[in-house]
A protein has these predicted regions:
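Mobile-element integrase/transposase regions
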Residues: 94, 99-100, 104-159, 165, ...
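Mobile genetic element proteins and their domesticated derivatives, centered on retroelements
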Residues: 32-33, 43, 74, 89, ...
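C-terminal domain-tail junction helix/linker
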Residues: 218, 242-332
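K/E-rich alpha-helical interaction surfaces of small helical-bundle regulatory domains
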Residues: 30-53, 82, 262-281
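RNase H-like two-metal-ion nuclease catalytic core shared by retroviral integrases
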Residues: 200-202, 208-215, 222-245, 255-264, ...
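Basic, flexible linker segments flanking DNA-binding modules
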Residues: 5-9, 44-138, 230, 288-292
Length: 332
């Protein structure tokens, strides 16, 4: 209801609704108003005008309002002097005899035309980014804590952004910048032709100069996510959550070797068997190797075959019922 007039009948209906249910339920009117989503000041203003039509005069032109030609002149003058601020622009127009307006009116006209904040850039936080279209374009890397027998260890994983395939992983008692380099290099050795963009958070291992040099020497690029914004690396954050909820906590590893065994089995299941909702309920291995079109086509074929089978079965059942009905009628 913000920015527009509320019709009187709607306004009075809201008043009647609040009064009626406040009496029936003994819930305060203030709470009902809050649930409805109306400010208390607006509600009590409506109640004071109950039964009367709207008498707003906000859209009646005032004598001091700028005329259309004046607004057009301000916009045209701004286009001729785009680097000037609105205050300087105002007095330049005043001295040049273009229009006689105040700085506030100049600001309103330029703001309504969307001509202010010429150097401002909208934040891209929360808008996402261009998703990879093929495997090995993006590799997400992150480090997470794993509780093993009451001791916390470091788990570092690399996840392919397109297929969600776990490229490589390792558990260590410490996870320095050098350890991360070893894990990334092991992943590169599995896929020698890959030159992905490495996406990470701003952990100390990833902002180190040696890690930057390693990425550059390997022919890859590196992108760090926005600080205090883990959603921008949400793919691998979600992987670590799945690992903990589906593998670590139910499996309860007793020591480091036991944890490696359990995680190895789970990752084999995750990569090759488990259907991933973000990629059309495919196994990451199938997506990685480009088998998704054949799988989708086979699924559609099976669904269509089942529909046709059910259709033919119902037709046969109806025909059989029709024959039985005809025979029964002939006997009678």
């Amino acid at each position: 209801m913000k920015g527009e007039w509320t019709p009187p009948d709607v306004r009075d209906t809201v008043i009647d609704f609040v009064n009626e249910w406040s009496d029936k339920t003994e819930i305060s009117a203030a709470r009902l108003i809050r649930w409805i989503g109306i400010r208390q000041g607006k509600f009590y203003d409506w109640r004071a005008r109950y039964g009367r039509v709207n008498e707003h005069n906000g859209w009646i032109p005032r004598d001091w309002w700028l005329e259309d030609w004046e607004k057009e002149a301000i916009i045209a003058f701004h286009a001729a002097h785009p680097l000037e601020g609105y205050r300087r622009l105002c007095f330049m127009m005043l001295d040049a005899g273009v229009v006689a307006v105040s700085p506030t009116s100049t600001w309103r006209v330029l703001h309504a035309a969307g001509l202010l904040r010429r150097f401002g850039k909208a934040s891209k936080k929360g808008t996402g980014f261009v998703q990879p279209l093929a495997p090995h374009e993006h590799w997400h890397v992150d480090i997470s804590y794993i509780n093993i027998g009451g001791t916390f260890y470091y788990l570092c994983s690399l996840l392919d952004g397109c297929s969600r395939y776990i490229v490589h992983w390792d558990i260590r008692e410490a996870m320095t910048e050098g350890d991360v380099e070893i894990i990334v290099q092991a992943a590169r050795e599995k896929f020698p032709g890959a030159a992905p963009r490495i996406i990470s958070d701003n952990g100390p291992q990833f902002i180190a100069r040696d890690f930057k040099d390693f990425i550059r020497i390997c022919g890859m690029t590196h992108v760090r996510t926005s600080p205090f914004y883990p959603q921008s690396n949400g793919k691998i954050e979600r992987w670590h959550k799945s690992l903990k909820t589906e593998c670590i906590r139910p499996g309860t590893p007793l020591n480091l070797d036991d944890a490696r065994r359990i995680i190895t089995g789970y990752i084999a299941h995750y990569n090759n068997v488990r259907l991933h909702s973000a990629i059309g309920y495919l196994a990451p291995k199938d997506k990685l190797e480009g088998r998704e079109k054949g799988i989708f086509a086979e699924r559609d074929r099976r669904i269509e075959e089942a529909r046709q089978r059910r259709k033919l079965a119902r037709q046969a059942e109806r025909e059989e019922q029709a024959v039985d009905t005809a025979l029964l009628a002939a006997v009678n």
